[in-house]
A protein has these predicted regions:
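Two-component/phosphorelay signaling modules centered on CheY-like receiver
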Residues: 10-28
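Acidic, metal-coordinating helix/loop segments flanking the phosphotransfer/catalytic sites
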Residues: 29-47, 68, 88
């Protein structure tokens, strides 16, 4: 089974993501960007779902570090900020896709399937 890291500090958003992933993927949770970087370094994930606004280390910084160390690992941005500048910052950090919150379940599944073969 493919393994996904969900980097999300908000409990409600994490519960929604577990609903999407349960049964199809193994998944772990990181509650901040620093934890996400550490977990990616220790485990073999196939994809990261990255909240961009988190404590300790934001998702953009965490994504840039992850992509530097693991360039082939797809990182998908999750954020309530949907302005063009936010999307561009996510791309610049290394995100391969951008999902706006609240996340639509079908869009999320399609995006995951696109990057996990």
């Amino acid at each position: 089974m493919k393994k996904i890291l969900v980097a999300e500090d908000n409990d409600s958003n994490y519960i929604l993501m577990t609903y999407v992933l349960k049964g199809s993927y193994e998944f772990d949770r990181a509650r901040n960007g620093k934890e996400a970087v550490e977990m990616v370094d220790r485990s073999g994930y196939h994809l990261v779902l990255m909240d961009l606004k988190m404590p300790v280390m934001d998702g953009l910084t965490a994504t840039a570090i992850i992509k530097e160390r693991h360039p082939q690992l797809p990182v998908v941005a999750l954020t309530a900020n949907v302005f063009d500048i936010d999307k561009q910052q996510a791309v610049d950090a290394g995100c391969v896709a951008f999902l706006a919150k609240p996340v639509k379940l079908q869009n999320c599944m399609e995006t995951i399937k696109k990057y996990i073969l």
